[in-house]
Amino acid sequence: MSGRPRTTSFAESCKPVQQPSAFGSMKVSRDKDGSKVTTVVATPGQGPDRPQEVSYTDTKVIGNGSFGVVYQAKLCDSGELVAIKKVLQDKRFKNRELQIMRKLDHCNIVRLRYFFYSSGEKKDVVYLNLVLDYVPETVYRVARHYSRAKQTLPVIYVKLYMYQLFRSLAYIHSFGICHRDIKPQNLLLDPDTAVLKLCDFGSAKQLVRGEPNVSYICSRYYRAPELIFGATDYTSSIDVWSAGCVLAELLLGQPIFPGDSGVDQLVEIIKVLGTPTREQIREMNPNYTEFKFPQIKAHPWTKVFRPRTPPEAIALCSRLLEYTPTARLTPLEACAHSFFDELRDPNVKLPNGRDTPALFNFTTQELSSNPPLATILIPPHARIQAAASTPTNATAASDANAGDRGQTNNAAFASASNST
């Protein structure tokens, strides 16, 4: 494989990108303590394109891969930590990850604060730098900690993490955006507050029915069977399959479908779900004609998991890990599943005694795929709290343009109240 950093996905059929006039403008100075301060001209992630100077310091590498490099830095004006994802930019096209992230504003999705371009060491090499929320942990590292201690993640955390993941998916799917790389490594966590944020939209794409997509997408262990069958007209339900794999992994303490190749992966899936029927294969990929699998019966889900696994967790898994893409629950339906009922209890707390993070501040955008589900998703105590905090007419206008992040959408609460 080439050592050249992989670019993130690019939007097709785009005109060449015009770089901002301040492109490549990067100044380095020293603060009073002698620390290196970098000042760039950056554009805010949301809102109008109004470039502004942003200064940061204490830069250090915290991750790298085929996509590029991720740095941690501290903003000089606020002292907040941020992550800066630096990726190779093809100047001929708009960067799809940037285009998608500028649309998104949700409490369970990592926020794009700014972006800026920088020059490479070689002539004509350009980098896109995404300045993102810094979140200290990942579901992958937390789960690995428990696994190494021969323990499983406490079920309350499984509920909190999966619920927030499904909320983030319901939100992006409402825009027709498919993440295409759901895995524990891409689920950021604040261990103190239990807030989860979905990150890394480098593989994400707005899916359009009838337009082909690459099937070699998504990380192994989490690839939906239709991708293994080579489907190119798949839907956002591939994210739901991946989320089901994450749920199963948190319950088991190890991946449910490990495999070093597509064939290995399929064998592992068949061991649990049984051999897919011809109809199921047709639903996954109508063009797939090879059918040479041994006939294996499905393994009972109750025997896949440990004896003390909550029945509701097993039931939810079985509704996510379905061969037929249309048979899988939608993310919003998953949020409404009885496995998450404990989170809707007004007295539930985190194990550390803190309140749970915001779980019911649904927006009309989030609920758009199935508005009646608001009656389940927004419990009575949350509706009462929302009604008590409803802004007066004088302040409502000023709040009208507030984003989704952490904002209580009173229209959503009202619809829930009216439906009950």
Swiss-Prot record:
It is found in: Cytoplasm; Nucleus; Cell membrane. The modification Phosphoserine is found at residues 9, 389. The keyword Chloroplast does not apply. GO terms for biological process: cellular response to interleukin-3; circadian rhythm; epithelial to mesenchymal transition; extrinsic apoptotic signaling pathway in absence of ligand; glycogen metabolic process; insulin receptor signaling pathway; negative regulation of calcineurin-NFAT signaling cascade; negative regulation of canonical Wnt signaling pathway. The modification Phosphotyrosine is found at residue 216. Keywords: ADP-ribosylation, ATP-binding, Biological rhythms, Carbohydrate metabolism, Cell membrane, Cytoplasm, Developmental protein, Differentiation, Glycogen metabolism, Kinase, Lipoprotein, Membrane, Neurogenesis, Nucleotide-binding, Nucleus, Palmitate, Phosphoprotein, Serine/threonine-protein kinase, Signal transduction inhibitor, Transferase, Wnt signaling pathway. Activated by phosphorylation at Tyr-216. In response to insulin, inhibited by phosphorylation at Ser-9 by PKB/AKT1; phosphorylation at this site causes a conformational change, preventing access of substrates to the active site. Inhibited by IL22 treatment which also triggers phosphorylation at Ser-9, promoting inactivation. Inhibited by lithium. PROSITE patterns: PROTEIN_KINASE_ATP, PROTEIN_KINASE_DOM, PROTEIN_KINASE_ST. InterPro entries: GSK-3, Kinase-like_dom_sf, Prot_kinase_dom, Protein_kinase_ATP_BS, Ser/Thr_kinase_AS, STKc_GSK3. Its main location: cytoplasm. SMART domains: S_TKc. Its EC number is 2.7.11.26, 2.7.11.1. The modification Phosphothreonine is found at residue 390. Gene3D superfamilies: Phosphorylase Kinase, domain 1, Transferase(Phosphotransferase) domain 1. Constitutively active protein kinase that acts as a negative regulator in the hormonal control of glucose homeostasis, Wnt signaling and regulation of transcription factors and microtubules, by phosphorylating and inactivating glycogen synthase (GYS1 or GYS2), EIF2B, CTNNB1/beta-catenin, APC, AXIN1, DPYSL2/CRMP2, JUN, NFATC1/NFATC, MAPT/TAU and MACF1. Requires primed phosphorylation of the majority of its substrates. In skeletal muscle, contributes to insulin regulation of glycogen synthesis by phosphorylating and inhibiting GYS1 activity and hence glycogen synthesis. Belongs to the protein kinase superfamily. CMGC Ser/Thr protein kinase family. GSK-3 subfamily. Monomer. Interacts with DAB2IP (via C2 domain); the interaction stimulates GSK3B kinase activation. Interacts (via C2 domain) with PPP2CA. Interacts with ARRB2, AXIN1, CABYR, DISC1, MMP2, MUC1, NIN, PRUNE1 and ZBED3. Interacts with AXIN1; the interaction mediates hyperphosphorylation of CTNNB1 leading to its ubiquitination and destruction. Interacts with and phosphorylates SNAI1. Interacts with DNM1L (via a C-terminal domain). Found in a complex composed of MACF1, APC, AXIN1, CTNNB1 and GSK3B. Interacts with SGK3. Interacts with the CLOCK-BMAL1 heterodimer. Interacts with the BMAL1. This is Glycogen synthase kinase-3 beta. The lineage of its organism: Eukaryota, Metazoa, Chordata, Craniata, Vertebrata. The gene is GSK3B.
